């Protein structure tokens, strides 16, 4: 669809937005691929339920099962403007950018070798994810020598782990089984 010809007002509005600008509006629809937001100062979208759009990863730093666990239709939100999606004529927003990054604070006070208590959140072919703090998950890789075939864990199991690597840039936490305990 040629958005310029279809809606000059919409195109002018989107073209006026600046990277990092904070936009407010109301959640109008929640889909499996993201959330539509009717922006306070924006015109209506000719096709979609809102000019603002938040992709699933930009909703929160924390793990969630569905977007409806983070926002609700009718809820007021404010998000940082990330980009103008020229294909869909949408303002891409981030709620996550408006929240403190829990990994940053965690990484500041965590050192390699630190023992942590956590619980198993996900089992994947390459290892086990363990939540060690609110919004913080680490991976015990299947190549970890302390993770043997005899170790059978289920989602929700409590475990003791040791921090083996913290990558602040990639926001990655690598863990190992605690040598004195059981996974």
Model-derived features: where do they sit?
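Single-stranded RNA-binding regions, centering on S1/OB-family and related RNA-binding modules
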Residues: 1-183
């Amino acid at each position: 669809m040629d958005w310029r010809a279809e809606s000059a007002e919409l195109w002018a509005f989107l073209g006026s937005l600046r990277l990092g600008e904070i936009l407010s509006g109301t959640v109008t629809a929640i889909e499996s691929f993201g959330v539509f937001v009717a922006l306070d100062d924006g015109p209506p979208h000719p096709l979609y339920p809102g000019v603002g759009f938040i992709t699933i990863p930009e909703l929160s730093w924390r793990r969630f099962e569905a977007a409806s666990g983070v926002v609700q239709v009718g809820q007021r939100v404010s998000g940082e403007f990330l980009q103008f999606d020229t294909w869909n004529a949408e303002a891409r927003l981030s709620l996550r950018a408006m929240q403190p990054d829990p990994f940053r604070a965690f990484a500041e006070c965590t050192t390699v070798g630190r023992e942590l208590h956590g619980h198993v959140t996900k089992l994947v072919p390459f290892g086990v994810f363990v939540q060690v703090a609110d919004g913080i998950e680490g991976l015990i890789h299947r190549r970890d020598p302390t993770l043997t075939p005899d170790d059978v864990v289920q989602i929700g199991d409590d475990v003791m782990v040791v921090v083996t690597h913290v990558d602040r840039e990639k926001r990655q936490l690598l863990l190992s089984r605690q040598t004195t305990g059981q996974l």
